[in-house]
Amino acid sequence: MEENMKTISLVYISLSGNTESFVTRLKDYLLSQYEGIEVQKIHIKDLVKEGQDFYEMDNPYVVFLPTYLEGGNGVDNGDVEILTTPVGDFIAYGDNASKCFGVVGSGNRNFNNQYCLTAKQYSQRFGFPVLADFEMRGMLEDIKRVAAIIADLYELEREN
């Protein structure tokens, strides 16, 4: 690895495959548009499944978080996170929360107030911003938008 390479770390969990698809396409897009970078994907579900211990991040990172909630409407009820809680445990581990640039939420707009609610809850809980959101698997425009945000955060230079 070159000494001046920047490592972009994308921490995520994907249950239905939508977030996995988005993060993979985002990685490919970033690598095609910016030089001097490597992109590290960290799938929390794999760490849990393989029984690996959580660890402290060496580099700043961005979290990608789908919304899975227990029933309800996200206002009076139905705002209890299910299935994605290991991501919160990973962020809370050691000093990881301080290294997180922010969260990108995903969900389904049909769920109105519940749309990206988990990302908003993490933002409040850990004190980092919701950087962006996308619906379902995300479109190319979403990938370009999120890539631009990441480029700003990591101060990346575009390839000519």
Residue ranges of model-derived segments:
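FMN-binding flavodoxin-like domain, especially the glycine-rich phosphate-binding loop
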Residues: 57-160
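N-terminal beta1-alpha1-beta2 submodule of the flavodoxin-like/Rossmannoid cofactor-binding fold
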Residues: 1-80, 84
